[in-house]
Amino acid sequence: VKIGIDGDDMIIPHHAHYEIPSFLDGTIMTLADAPWPGLTPDLLSVLLVVATQARGSVLIHQKMFESRLFFVDKLIDMGAQIILCDPHRAVVVGQDHRITLRAGRMTSPDIRAGIALLIAALSATGTSRIDNIEQIDRGYQDIELRLNQLGAHITRTDD
């Protein structure tokens, strides 16, 4: 991924493909959370969803908290290629857009999983429905308004 810096802004231009590199000996990349200044654990769920659309495989290792990867079954139902190894580790096999995620109905179990499911729904074909959005609202104020301004098509319903 090519990244540009403009003052305090990080610019990520459009890429046709995102590739997850592997090591020379064939082992796959590992993304693991760590205390500051390491990778914040709140981003692992989002990175897991992004990896489903990349080319290559990655091991997501949630070291700091229990049971934060238990939402991956919903992504698997959407067509993602993910192997849940244990409560702390999941292997994502990115399909480089060859397999499009399918829309579905899901429930947001918490803030982090909720935003990850929302991102997955935005990349899916069809209309998805996410219940228990109060979880997402706790961490992301006016999220549908802000994403709609970027081109998303999100509608909040009362039922």
For each feature predicted by the language model, list its residue ranges.
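Short, structured segments at the rim of ligand-binding sites
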Residues: 1-159
